[in-house]
A protein has these predicted regions:
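Catalytic or ion-translocation cores adjacent to nucleophile or general acid/base/metal-coordination motifs
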Residues: 2, 42-60
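Coil-to-beta-strand transition motifs
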Residues: 35, 46-47, 216
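Structured soluble/peripheral alpha/beta segments that form catalytic or ligand/cofactor-binding pockets
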Residues: 26-30, 37-40, 49, 59
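C-terminus-biased signal that marks the final domain/tail of proteins
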Residues: 12, 16-17, 24-27, 56-355
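Gly/Pro-rich turn-and-neighbor structural signature
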Residues: 2-36
Length: 355
């Protein structure tokens, strides 16, 4: 985090951006705030962060950032940057401490965007994810809701109502406002359906999750969960990360569509299933559940298997090959089922009984 911050101060950037850092002990989130300025905050151990495409860190402890730096870091000139550009939007009567001693400085208010576009593109996605993660801790809907889809003060992080699983992450990154009037596949009014940008959107190429498992030996600790194509219809596959090569099913993606490649097979599944969402829903759900269950089973086998003294990476790569073979088999079966339903639903279908 500090190294990237120093590079940022030296070279700068032309846009705001964010990046997460993690090891087995902690997670930090760094945000560039334009030019040569940056902030970073340690994610509390019992909290989750929800980050759409906008500046996200809300409350920032400037006292810690310029003091012990236990949970907050920033560029050295941040205080002068705030002061010289009049970015402290706290009302004078509310500011009872010097800026350098402020423990709850609102970075999102000072540096972030609050555009109308955010209220269709960003805040609704954060609202849906936070609503899923903490459904009982806050009121999310109705006239007495604490947080609504277009609010600018949605929390950057919160304590979820329960522990978060890999499957939860996949569901959220595939979501399209299920159970709300805003679901483009749902039964809401035309004015509400498609009102907000879904999280699982058609142009997604891949999604990944890095899982660090402290209960495993170091060589097997890191697992990368990968899905390719549109998240609504694809499946999460686990792979050992401590390897020097990737299974050909994933690594040999060409420019032309090919059903023998994970990416293209999933792109085809998504394109076919989208127009027949209800008819293919069962096949998609079975596909996603089968890959997740069989992937976990193979991962558990690999976790228990002995590794050679030499060639650890290749041994784990061979387990990845087994997992990729399973994923290919399940993907081909899903493609066949989706193609069958889509073919039956073509507009030029006709039966003798229709005459």
């Amino acid at each position: 985090v500090i190294r990237l911050g120093k590079l940022h101060e030296q070279f700068g950037t032309y846009e705001m951006n964010g990046i997460g850092f993690q090891d087995v002990n902690e997670i930090w989130w760094l945000e560039s705030i334009g030019g040569h300025h940056w902030i970073a905050k340690r994610v509390p151990d019992d909290e989750v962060v929800v980050m759409p495409n906008q500046q996200g860190i809300d409350y920032f402890d400037l006292c810690d950032a310029f003091g012990e730096q236990k949970e907050h870091l920033c560029s050295q000139d941040l205080l002068s940057f705030i002061t010289e550009n009049h970015l402290d939007l706290t009302l004078n009567e509310e500011r009872d401490v010097p800026l350098a001693k402020d423990t709850v400085f609102d970075c999102r208010l000072a540096f972030g965007s609050h555009d109308d576009a955010d209220h269709t593109y960003n805040t609704p996605r954060a609202w849906f994810m936070l609503r899923y993660l903490a459904p009982f801790s806050y009121k999310w809907e109705g006239p007495d809701a604490i947080f609504r889809p277009e609010d600018d003060d949605l929390p950057w992080s919160l304590v979820p109502d329960r522990k978060v699983t890999v499957e939860d992450v996949k569901y959220l990154l595939s979501s399209h406002y299920q159970g709300t009037p805003y679901d483009p596949y749902g039964r809401g009014s035309e004015a509400q359906k498609g009102k907000y940008r879904p999280i699982g959107i058609n142009r997604t190429n891949f999604v990944a999750l890095t899982q660090l498992r402290p209960y495993m030996p170091p060589e097997k600790m890191a697992v990368e969960w990968i899905a390719e194509g549109c998240n609504v219809y694809n499946a999460f596959v686990p792979f050992y990360a401590n390897v020097d090569r990737t299974p050909e099913y994933l690594s040999q993606t060409g420019e032309l569509p090919d059903t023998h490649e994970f990416y293209w097979a999933n792109r085809l599944i998504g394109a076919l299933a989208d127009s027949h969402h209800a008819a293919t829903a069962s096949a998609i759900e079975r596909y996603q559940n089968a890959v997740a269950a069989k992937g976990r089973a193979l991962l558990q086998e690999g976790d228990k298997a002995d590794l050679p003294a030499d060639g650890v990476s290749e041994a784990l790569a061979q387990w990845n090959d087994k997992i990729a073979s399973m994923a290919q088999e399940e993907t081909q079966k899903a493609l066949g089922k989706v193609l069958y339903e889509a073919s039956n639903g073509m507009k030029n279908s006709f039966a003798r009984s229709d005459a």
